[in-house]
Amino acid sequence: MSGVELQPESTQSEEKEEPKTAATTISSTEETKTENPNVALDNLAKTPIQLILQPTPQTPAKTPETPRIQKINNLKKSASFDSKNQPEDSKTPKQRDQLIEVPSDEVGRVENNIDNLPFYHGFMGRTECESMLSNHGDFLIRMTEVGRRVAYVISVRWHYQNSHVLVKRTKTKKLYWTKKYAFKSICELIAYHKLNQIPFYDNMTLICGLARHEWQLNNEQVTLNKKLGEGQFGEVHKGKLKTSVFTPPVIVAVKTLHQNHLSANEKILFLKEANVMLTLAHPNVIKFYGVCTMKEPIMIVMEFCDGSSLEDVLLSKESKVSSEDKILYLFHAACGIDYLHGKHVIHRDIAARNCLLNSKKVLKISDFGLSVKGVAIKERKGGCLPVKYMAPETLKKGFYSTASDIYSYGALVYEVYTDGKTPFESCGLRGNELRKAIIGKSVILTIDVECPEFVKAIFEQSRLYDTEQRISSKRIIEIFKEEAGMHELDATGLFGRIGSFFSRVRRQKEAEPSVPILT
């Protein structure tokens, strides 16, 4: 999977591509003129399929009959219908213009459940798919939406170009076809063209089907239990993931997509989070198990953290977060952010609500719905944005970088040491007024509560307006190691070192602690 933005399928190829009456003999003359496989689908969408009335050698009949699909029982032995043995231009109009139904016994015994085909990948965006096509002849079958209808697409790599061919259906018999031959099922269409190496569109044949990855899960592997929350596109559940018949199921968190009233573009945006998480593996980043895209509901399966979010812990009235734990959580967050930046991932929504804790007090960065891959990007878009956490260069010009994540990390430090207060909560400004105030420096976030001096210095360096002067995640980690003795990510190993730091601070209570130089 690639991390670039995914584009929804074109909505040009809809019902107009299907025959308009019970007749299923169609014109493919224009189709054979397509020379560039990269625009095959687009050209087909622009060419209306016409009904072809078979000419009679005698005097024209008063009321010509509309021909039906031609059905032949010995297609493999018939050279006149074998596109491998006869060039397209040498065929007579009658041969070229007919859509031929291939009976099931001519195809042979095939798998009739498309979910069981190893190269069927379920719902997938075009760009995401193209990242998997690398060699000539590679192909996969995926599901998309054309308008509001679900359709199958054959995506193939052919002579260093990617093509996406929509599988169409006839009006009355609902047969599947792409070029010349029609079948009762999509599985028969694929099996026949692959076995006989007959071009399924232009001169393209199906050579090497790309199998699904381990992270492409079947819906049957996931069991949904307690609902944990609800988001923009769906719900979050606690559930179980069955990875093997020999091992017990894993407790997971599952994001499910609402099944109704969502466009293809919204579904692609939902899966964008999984696209970013694919290559991530770090103790301070939420673990990604996989996605279920074979059928509804579409799901993202992730690690379940049984310790709630950092925001909930900070706001809890039952117990106050200790000074030791505050240091611990901020160190873990810095480690997670540094790992993301090393993978060229900009999170774009660092906040206490997106930091999860497990039972061992290990913090994990989560929620990659706004994340992008890259070192720096410029994006101007509306919608609901976390203005109170965003950097001034983002609010002013839509510019995102690793430095803008560090600015948000400063807001996280503020949340931790104010026991969960929202940044700029007391200034009384909201929305565009707050955005202008942050850009114009008329409001500045400060920590006025008791806080270790080195943490306060990190906070101040992270909130600098000049992105070049802002502290880096690597330097933040170094300071935590130097000042608090942190060298391991294991929570148990950290407690002793944190304790020794605070013991030293208490012994030097009356002395003014030195402020580290942050470079």
Swiss-Prot record:
Domain SH2: 119-208
PROSITE patterns hit by this protein: PROTEIN_KINASE_DOM (PS50011), PROTEIN_KINASE_TYR (PS00109), SH2 (PS50001)
Binding site for ATP: V146, G147, R148, R149, V150, A151, Y152, V153, I154, K184
GO cellular component: cytoplasm; plasma membrane
Skewed-composition ranges (Polar residues): 73-84
Free-text tissue specificity from the UniProt record: Expressed in hermaphrodite larvae but not in adult. Expressed in both male larvae and adult.
Reactions mediated catalytically: L-tyrosyl-[protein] + ATP = O-phospho-L-tyrosyl-[protein] + ADP + H(+)
This protein's name: Spermatocyte protein spe-8
